[in-house]
Amino acid sequence: MSDKQGLTVDAILTNLKQSNIEWQQVLENVISAFDCTTGTIHFLDQGTELLQIQAHKGIPPFLIPKLSTIPIGKGMAGIAAERKEAVEMCNLQTDDSGVARPAAKETKVEGSIAVPMLLNGKLYGTLGIAKPVPYDFTEDERNSLLKIGEEMSKALLA
């Protein structure tokens, strides 16, 4: 992780301690910090156990209805929520594991990662970002995203 990215991640973590959080801005800051173009934030509806879209960027409008509500275990976000760990693809376009839903390929992104928003082992949602090129996220990047997810969870409880 570069110093620039480290400072940006620190700035994101600091912003998550504010009382009035703009989730769209948080997502845009994360996308920028990790040199990505696309992203989503889903919050877990504790009553229905469904992930509900809270913020998105770079998603084609016709796909929004398909990812507004995601069941646990479906697609990258749903699997990250189910496993409570990061789910990553170097190239979503060529993936044939079944993890990515068919509609996900219509985003035209390649390197992508979804991380759970966890606090003390409890799921609060997911954060997903992607690049338009094949990419493997580093362990430092995964850890930073998980830390951001933890701080997002704390912010939801504040």
Describe these PLM feature segments.
Residues 2, 130-148, 155-158:
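Regulatory loop-to-helix N-cap segments in sensory/regulatory domains
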Residues 60-63, 90-111, 131:
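Signal-transducing coupling segments at domain and membrane junctions
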Residues 44, 61-94:
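Regulatory sensory and allosteric helical modules in signal-transduction proteins
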Residues 1-21:
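Signal-transmission linkers at sensory-effector interfaces
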Residues 110-118:
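A short, aliphatic-rich beta-strand micro-motif
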Residues 77, 117-131:
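Sensory-domain boundary capping and coupling elements
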Residues 27-31, 37-45, 78:
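Short, hydrophobic-rich beta-strand element in sensory/regulatory alpha-beta domains
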Residues 41-64:
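GAF sensory/regulatory domain recognition
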